[in-house]
Amino acid sequence: MSEVVIICSSSDPASSNIASRLLELAEWDEEGTLRFHRSYCMLCIEGELVGLRNLEDMLDRIGLSPRLIIFASRHISKEAVPWLGGHFTGVVREGSFELSRPAPYALKKLLMALQRHAPSTFRLSAEATHHGPVDLRTPSLFAEIGSCEQHWIDPAAGAAVARAILELESYEAHADETVLLGIGGGHYVQRQTELILSRPVAFGHMFSKYQASMLNVEAIKKAADLSGASGVYLDGKSFRSDERRRLEEIAASLDLNVMGIKEVRSL
């Protein structure tokens, strides 16, 4: 049984780079369009990963019922900074939201592995939840290379992400750690990344300060339930007092413990 499914796209140069490095780093058995290694299955598709719908139905039809789905992908940024990282998927808009199930412990292990394997010129971080797929019931994450063509095809960057992915079989090793939602910070959620890498804590869905005003009680409840979160980290530098109070009141109504950076660092 393949417990971890890796989805790659032939139209994405970073995804193809990661797939090539995975094939080099491990021995894979080929069955049609699928590749198998231990409990991993790698599937390459055509087209964009972010627009996939009903992926689990397609996987079920070919006999795959994974416990974790990993999307190997490029990351695009106007700044063209060399970057490695990962994030969960979902879209939050004013008055509506769609969220897939995140994999908090897998993202933590991915970032810890990338910290060891990343080329020295590449920055590392998680990102706030964004884009699709938005309908996944299986825990999932994106593992990415950024931020331009030069970086997407860099073999060392591809190898770093591939090595990190190959360490995710045992991501439950962190399953006794506290899981929090994260709200605040920029898109690259630097303080949440620091906490993930330094403290016995994992993060489920993370939302930037730019998304915070669109989070209502239903969105936060859904994010917490999907993440298995027992609390909410609120980034202290991100909110006016009235906005922070609104978020604290929502968290209290959902019995979620509100924590700042000092409280999380003390864990």
Swiss-Prot record:
Coiled-coil region(s): none
Catalysed reaction equations from the record: a D-aminoacyl-tRNA + H2O = a tRNA + a D-alpha-amino acid + H(+); glycyl-tRNA(Ala) + H2O = tRNA(Ala) + glycine + H(+)
Gene this protein is translated from: dtdA
Alphabetic keyword roster: Hydrolase, Metal-binding, Zinc
Cofactor note: Binds 2 Zn(2+) ions per subunit.
Biological function: D-aminoacyl-tRNA deacylase with broad substrate specificity. By recycling D-aminoacyl-tRNA to D-amino acids and free tRNA molecules, this enzyme counteracts the toxicity associated with the formation of D-aminoacyl-tRNA entities in vivo.
Alphabetized SUPFAM superfamilies for the sequence: AF0625-like
Alphabetized Pfam families for the sequence: tRNA_deacylase
GO molecular function: D-aminoacyl-tRNA deacylase activity; zinc ion binding
Obligatory cofactor(s): Zn(2+)
Family as reported in the entry's similarity comment: Belongs to the DtdA deacylase family.
GO biological process: D-amino acid catabolic process
Protein name: D-aminoacyl-tRNA deacylase
EC number: 3.1.1.96
Organism of derivation: Methanothrix thermoacetophila (strain DSM 6194 / JCM 14653 / NBRC 101360 / PT)
Assembly notes: Monomer.
